[in-house]
A protein has these predicted regions:
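Conserved nucleotide-sugar donor-binding catalytic segment
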Residues: 4-82
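C-terminal subregions of glycosyltransferases and related glycan-biosynthesis enzymes
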Residues: 37, 44, 50, 72-167
């Protein structure tokens, strides 16, 4: 999907989906210092995602609209970029509750981020993180209301449908 440069800079967007590729990131000393805090095992889903959250919450995340490397995925990549339009991707996500598990993981990451950086966050950011972290415990209507009210939508039709139907 085509990524909107303004959405990539918003904490709301970065809570639900990473759009950052670590090997293309540049960070400054302030961000590096903030990133050196201990985080519980399994609470930080990906280091580049975590760094983007810190930048969006306490500074700025800037989108560069040009390729800086030739990225290709090798057969042995465990994560790597996936194509959400492919049938294989959709089937893999539907099997065994993967969509829900993925969304619950992002909520857990939001709670860990709040715990780690509460003192540096604005009251609105604290409320956003607390609301999103608590989302797995809420009913579907309450979660959808939160997404709509806070703009917590994933990029791409397939991802958004998965977010609506399976969480």
């Amino acid at each position: 999907c085509k990524v909107n440069q303004y959405e990539t800079q918003a904490m709301e967007q970065l809570l639900v989906q990473t759009v950052v590729t670590g090997c293309t990131m540049m960070i400054n000393r302030s961000l590096a210092r903030l990133a050196c805090r201990p985080v519980g095992e399994g609470d930080m889903l990906m280091h580049d995602w975590w760094l983007a959250l810190i930048a969006a919450a306490m500074g700025r995340a800037v989108f560069l609209d040009r390729a800086t490397i030739d990225y290709r995925q090798h057969g042995g990549n465990v994560v790597g970029a996936k194509d959400p339009r492919s049938a294989g991707y959709v089937l893999q996500k539907l099997k065994g509750g993967a969509v829900r598990r993925s969304l619950v993981d992002t909520a857990r990451q939001a709670g860990a981020f709040l715990s780690c950086y509460r003192q540096e966050l604005t009251p609105d950011q604290q409320a956003l993180l607390a609301d999103y972290a608590a989302a797995p415990e809420k009913g579907k209507l309450a979660r959808l209301t939160l997404y709509r009210r806070r703009g917590l939508w994933k990029h791409g039709l397939n991802r958004r449908i998965g977010q609506i139907l399976w969480w």
